[in-house]
């Protein structure tokens, strides 16, 4: 096998609290993450007569295709880990392509899930030289969302993330729901978003435990009532289009919530017709709306 194509699933946050700011400036979090069917596609192949060891292309012209891209960095870290694991391992040239569908800078882990898919594809091309724990260790060095995306792209769509979000515990899957993702296009750079919440109270009463309990019993209504995102209080006053998307979704969805640090907003629905109506309402206001489902 010389070519592998992997779906790279988007991430939403069912629960997201910031618990502390460390002396080094990083924040610790408690978050429950869920994969949805909206996805990019990452293709990795071993080309014949390759000139460069790594080549990266992307369908979106605004995505850099060099060493700054997380997919490129994932490939470099994978080869380093494979060589450390087995001294007989020899690097092979790779050509990688990202077909983008996930809105960028929306709190949906688009770059992280592409990197996770690349790690999985490279490992399969290398005959599974690394186990899942080794892949997760690489992922944790690439970014806080990458370990969850590895788990999700391997078939574990719901997980609890602690510390910086990289300490993962697989949770019972969310009951099947319809999802509308609304992208206002305003963008929320992560450092800016975290700077906005430093003055806010960081930990809601009881923390993430009620959400884990709701998932364990498999009750959608209990999940809806326990959804929380600290960033809403900080982001919506600064991103009016995201707030407008939230207002529209709230009129139709069982629950609407900001995803990650924004600016994408998601709505969860038990009724597919209501999800379609919400999509149409968002598009009528000029927002990009994606109809998908939980995994």
Predicted regions and their residues:
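Glycine/serine-rich anion-binding loops at beta->alpha junctions
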Residues: 97-126, 144, 255-269
């Amino acid at each position: 096998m010389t070519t592998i194509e992997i779906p790279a699933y988007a991430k939403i946050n069912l629960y997201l609290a910031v618990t502390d700011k460390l002396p080094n400036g990083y924040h610790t979090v408690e978050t429950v993450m869920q994969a949805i069917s909206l996805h990019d596609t990452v293709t990795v192949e071993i080309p014949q007569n390759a000139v460069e060891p790594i080549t990266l292309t992307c369908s979106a012209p605004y995505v850099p295709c060099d060493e700054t891209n997380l997919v490129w960095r994932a490939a470099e870290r994978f080869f380093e880990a494979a060589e450390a694991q087995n001294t007989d391992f020899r690097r092979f040239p790779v050509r990688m392509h990202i077909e983008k569908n996930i809105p960028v800078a929306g709190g949906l882990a688009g770059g992280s899930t592409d990197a996770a898919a690349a790690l999985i594809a490279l490992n399969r091309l290398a005959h599974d030289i690394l186990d899942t724990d080794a892949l997760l260790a690489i992922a944790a060095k690439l970014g806080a969302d990458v370990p969850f995306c590895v788990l999700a792209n391997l078939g574990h769509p719901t997980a609890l993330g602690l510390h910086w979000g990289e300490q993962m515990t697989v949770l019972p899957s969310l009951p099947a729901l319809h999802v509308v993702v609304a992208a206002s296009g305003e963008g929320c750079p992560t450092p800016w978003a975290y700077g906005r919440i430093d003055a806010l109270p960081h930990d809601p009463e009881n923390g993430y435990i009620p959400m884990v309990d709701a998932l364990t019993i498999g009750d959608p209504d209990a999940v809806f009532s326990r959804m929380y995102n600290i960033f809403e209080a900080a982001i919506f006053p600064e991103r009016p289009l995201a707030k407008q998307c939230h207002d529209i979704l709230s009129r139709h969805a069982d629950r609407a919530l900001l995803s990650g640090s924004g600016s994408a907003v998601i709505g969860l629905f038990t009724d597919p017709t209501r999800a379609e109506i919400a999509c149409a309402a968002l598009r009528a206001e000029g927002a990009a709306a994606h109809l998908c489902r939980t995994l």
